[in-house]
Each structure stands twice: as C-alpha cells, then as structure tokens.
C-alpha cells in the first residue's frame, strides 16, 4: 500500500496532555521580571506516561496574549513548552502540527492559563507554595489515517498497558487523582454559578416587591 493511501475502516488515536503549571515568583525572580509580574508559568503539550510525541508531532505553536513580546511561539522539538512570567490569566491557543508525511491537518486546542489556586484543593495548593496545575486530557483521533500515520502509531504503542496511575507523580502528572480533581473543580464552579444565579434572582424579586409596594401618585 502506498504511503499516501488511506487505511479504510480504521481508527487510531493518541492521548496527549495540554496544560500549564504556575507558581508565585520568588524574591530573586521578581528582581529580574517586569515590575507588575507576579507568577512564573509554563504551558505545555506532552504525551501520557512519558510517550515521545515528537515521533508524530512536528511542531506546536502557542499563541500567547498580545501583550507579550513575540506572542506566537513555535516549538519544533521536545519539550513542547513555553515558560514565561506574568500577572493575569488568559486563553492560549495551542496548534499542533503533524509530520508532513502524515498528510493530516493541524489541530487547534484552547487552554485557559491558571495562575491562582481555586476549587476544592485551594488551601492545599496555597500550603504547597501556591503551585497550581491545570491539565486537560485530550484524545487525538485519526479516522482512516494515511498508511504512514497508521504504521508509525502502530509501531509505537503508548504506555505499559496498566491504565492511569492512581496518584499523580512528577514524571506522570495525569492520573485518576488529577482526573477527579478536575471533576471536583467543575462541580465547584457549577455550584458557584448556581449561588450567583440565586443571588440575582433574590435581588430581582426584592426590586419587584419594592416596585409593587410603591404607591402610584
């Protein structure tokens, strides 16, 4: 089969991690950073269980906030990451390009840069020096991939077949623990939104009550 021929009725996928970590600047780091910057942070794309994604990822382009010098950063070799300092949170566009031989279109993801502890683990994060980790698990699916992509991914299986680790470790940040933490963060955010909606409802009802009780002259 020719390399530029698609493998029909076939689907092959690869998991990746798109995320960031951040921590407050130390006194020494503050002296070197812009005066308004408060944190050092890292945005990254990496494989699960230490997989070398450079075998099938050609480059990763990170689009930072326009206030940064050279906001479009192109990383063509691992680690696919950008390390910066800053003071605010914002959305980062992450564009992943594959090997030319794969004939696959680039994929775009968006990651919201997190700098400050939040959610159920807020106090734990503060106690650990303010280190924040925000990681998205993404599944890249190749439907009817070209022969080159199919062979490349088939010959380079991922992980050790034991699934996700129970707890996070420095070399393996994505785990059942992190997955649960992300779910807890979502639940926390949903509850906060519900509280806000209820507060506004009460304010509206109060205003309506005041209006109806005001005598008409």
From Swiss-Prot:
It is found in: Cytoplasm; Nucleus. Component of the SWR1 chromatin-remodeling complex and of the NuA4 histone acetyltransferase complex. Belongs to the YAF9 family. GO terms for biological process: chromatin remodeling; DNA repair; DNA repair-dependent chromatin remodeling; regulation of transcription by RNA polymerase II; transcription initiation-coupled chromatin remodeling. One of its GO terms (molecular function) is histone binding. The coiled-coil domain is required for assembly into the NuA4 complex. Residues 180-214 form a coiled coil. PANTHER family: PROTEIN AF-9 HOMOLOG (PTHR47573:SF1). CDD domains: YEATS_Yaf9_like (cd16908). Component of the SWR1 complex which mediates the ATP-dependent exchange of histone H2A for the H2A variant HZT1 leading to transcriptional regulation of selected genes by chromatin remodeling. Component of the NuA4 histone acetyltransferase complex which is involved in transcriptional activation of selected genes principally by acetylation of nucleosomal histones H4 and H2A. The NuA4 complex is also involved in DNA repair. Yaf9 may also be required for viability in conditions in which the structural integrity of the spindle is compromised. Keywords: Activator, Chromatin regulator, Coiled coil, Cytoplasm, DNA damage, DNA repair, Nucleus, Transcription, Transcription regulation. This is Protein AF-9 homolog. Residues 6-156 form the YEATS domain. It holds the Pfam family YEATS. One of its GO terms (cellular component) is nucleus. InterPro entries: YEAST_sf, YEATS, YEATS_dom.
């Amino acid at each position: 089969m020719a390399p530029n021929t698609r493998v029909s009725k076939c689907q092959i996928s690869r998991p990746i991690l798109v995320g960031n970590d951040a921590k407050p600047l130390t006194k020494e780091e503050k002296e070197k950073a812009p005066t308004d910057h408060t944190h050092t942070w890292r945005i990254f794309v990496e494989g699960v269980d230490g997989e070398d994604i450079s075998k099938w990822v050609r480059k990763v382009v990170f689009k930072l906030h326009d206030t940064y010098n050279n906001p479009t950063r192109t990383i063509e070799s691992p680690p696919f990451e950008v390390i910066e300092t800053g003071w605010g949170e914002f959305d980062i566009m992450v564009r992943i390009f594959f090997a030319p031989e794969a004939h696959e279109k680039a994929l775009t993801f968006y990651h919201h840069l997190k700098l400050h502890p939040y959610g159920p683990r807020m106090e734990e994060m503060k106690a650990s020096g303010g280190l924040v980790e925000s990681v998205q698990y993404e599944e890249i699916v190749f439907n009817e991939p070209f022969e080159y992509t199919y062979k490349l991914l088939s010959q380079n299986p991922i992980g050790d077949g034991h699934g996700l680790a129970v707890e996070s470790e420095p070399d393996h940040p994505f785990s059942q623990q992190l997955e649960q933490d992300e779910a807890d963060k979502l639940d926390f955010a949903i509850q906060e939104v519900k509280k806000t909606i209820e507060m506004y409802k009460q304010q509206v009802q109060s205003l309506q009550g005041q209006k109806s009780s005001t005598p008409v002259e």
